[in-house]
Amino acid sequence: MSYKIMAINAGSSSLKFQLLEMPQGDMLCQGLIERIGMADAQVTIKTHSQKWQETVPVADHRDAVTLLLEKLLGYQIINSLRDIDGVGHRVAHGGEFFKDSTLVTDETLAQIERLAELAPLHNPVNALGIHVFRQLLPDAPSVAVFDTAFHQTLDEPTYIYPLPWRYYAELGIRRYGFHGTSHKYVSGVLAEKLGVPLSALRVICCHLGNGSSICAIKNGRSVNTSMGFTPQSGVMMGTRSGDIDPSILPWIAQRESKTPQQLNQLLNNESGLLGVSGVSSDYRDVEQAANTGNRQAKLALTLFAERIRATIGSYIMQMGGLDALVFTGGVGENSARARSAVCHNLQFLGLAVDEEKNQRNATFIQTENALVKVAVINTNEELMIAQDVMRIALPATEGLCVPA
């Protein structure tokens, strides 16, 4: 028996969706509604054989969901709203409260809204998306899938910051980590491809894109991750600085009379590859500029790789070794240059890349005699969300639900 599961990622002015047939994992359609709240919202829906695009007024998220469901019916992707057996919602922050994906109830939704202080730009609109789908599809269970939940296995010395204790006890300031859905999915696929239980592996997963994070996974548990209290911390990213000396901020604020909001803008939107290269936040553009001799672009690419290498080294020490290094995300999946730079001169760890395999994006790119497997695995957060819906809302199907 198959089930139609919808995976939803609600943004402040957008709604990204995918409809999957489970447990096969087949994508039936995917799409995006952008510029919600505007008279010229953009609607894009794609199947394997067709693509529809139009510009229409979309007043709010309720309008967006209503429009989406109307289009699915109108394009005969579904015959009835009852065809949708469950809905999985990506939620940015689960705090310490949610340690796994969970079936949405009124109390669950209220708790997600209470956690908005930890993710003020994301949790409120995630909650709104859940609320609208529960209203319009009352017979389809909703499951909340948290970016932070996979990292709730971190040990206390790993997630506590060396600040006065009250900031953790009273305000919840600690390392939470993000990209958990991606890290969980990719590590599971890796174990399937190796034919080894994840519980027997030491894995470092590099999710590299405009937002990047590294995760150390030992015996199937996240034991460290580069993003912390916010997704701004960790390694260098497209427009985010990652970790820097915190005293730089008050120094800049005093010199340039910047407000906290302006400093946040600087760290989140003007730094990283964009800030150092002066070219772009897109790795491909920076790579192209570096190939033409742009010194700052070359420096940006070197910094990007070196921050990742330093993180990998510390995680290997923490886990007492490494069985597999995995690349995923837009850059990790598509840039042979980035993968090569990250793995450069790591032969002493038993880690070496075969450049011919690397250039053709093979699944495993390590040399024949390397001790550490090096894999390139496409992430699929939507499929992971759908699998969690199957596991939690339709538990009788759990045994059928495996990574594709």
Curated annotation (Swiss-Prot):
Pfam families: Acetate_kinase. It is found in: Cytoplasm. The keyword Cytoplasm applies. SUPFAM superfamilies: Actin-like ATPase domain. Its EC number is 2.7.2.15. One of its GO terms (molecular function) is propionate kinase activity. InterPro entries: Ac/propionate_kinase (IPR004372), Aliphatic_acid_kin_short-chain (IPR000890), Aliphatic_acid_kinase_CS (IPR023865), ATPase_NBD (IPR043129), Propionate_kinase_PduW (IPR024896). Keywords: ATP-binding, Cytoplasm, Kinase, Nucleotide-binding, Transferase. One of its GO terms (biological process) is propionate catabolic process. Pathway: Polyol metabolism; 1,2-propanediol degradation. The keyword Transferase applies. GO terms for cellular component: cytoplasm. It is an enzyme of class 2 (transferase). Belongs to the acetokinase family. PduW subfamily. Works with phosphate acetyltransferase (pta) to capture exogenous propionate and regenerate propionyl-CoA during degradation of 1,2-propanediol (1,2-PD). PANTHER family: ACETATE KINASE, ACETATE KINASE-RELATED. This is Propionate kinase. It comes from Salmonella paratyphi C (strain RKS4594). The lineage of its organism: Bacteria, Pseudomonadati, Pseudomonadota, Gammaproteobacteria, Enterobacterales.
